[in-house]
């Protein structure tokens, strides 16, 4: 493979531009045995071993994932998050013991993302099937996040369950993946009912 092709592949990753991609490739080339080969092997293993959870859309080595399969978790408490990074932020902080539903993004008129492009179609069915008592909307406080929250509230509110949203700690325009554990913990504990 051409070195420039590898640099361009890294540049397609989030938060990597041409300069940082070039530095990474140079580091890999200088450290083939200790870094490059184990990294390549790890990426290949992940590509073949991971799968999307059939229940919550998490990524794991099994489906249903280890979170959905955990009998110690509160399966009547469902936190709807925008992306996998948000789920991982909650898990890293060890502040939430319910289960999740990963949307895969937010509704966005600007980017043409409608309900059909997100994991929204089975939320009502899941709430009924698993006797969920509370839905926590754990979506960032962006404009698209607010639109998505409103949409979810509309499709869930007739089910007679508690619907809450994360409160203090999330600034306007803020995204959950960028919050520290303390801020995320405060937001989770001070959530409020929206329907």
From Swiss-Prot:
Annotated Gene Ontology MF terms?
Answer: DNA binding; zinc ion binding
- Which is an annotated Pfam family here? RecR_HhH
Q: Which residues form the Toprim domain?
A: 76-171
Please indicate which superkingdom the organism of origin belongs to. Bacteria
Which BP terms from GO are recorded? Answer: DNA recombination; DNA repair
Q: Which UniProt keywords apply?
A: DNA damage, DNA recombination, DNA repair, Metal-binding, Zinc, Zinc-finger
Entries under PROSITE patterns matching the protein: RECR, TOPRIM
Q: Where are the zinc fingers (C4-type)?
A: 53-68
Q: Which HAMAP family match?
A: RecR
* Family in the record: Belongs to the RecR family.
Q: What does this protein do?
A: May play a role in DNA repair. It seems to be involved in an RecBC-independent recombinational process of DNA repair. It may act with RecF and RecO.
Alphabetized PANTHER family for the sequence: RECOMBINATION PROTEIN RECR
What protein name is recorded for this chain?
Recombination protein RecR
**Gene encoding the protein:** recR
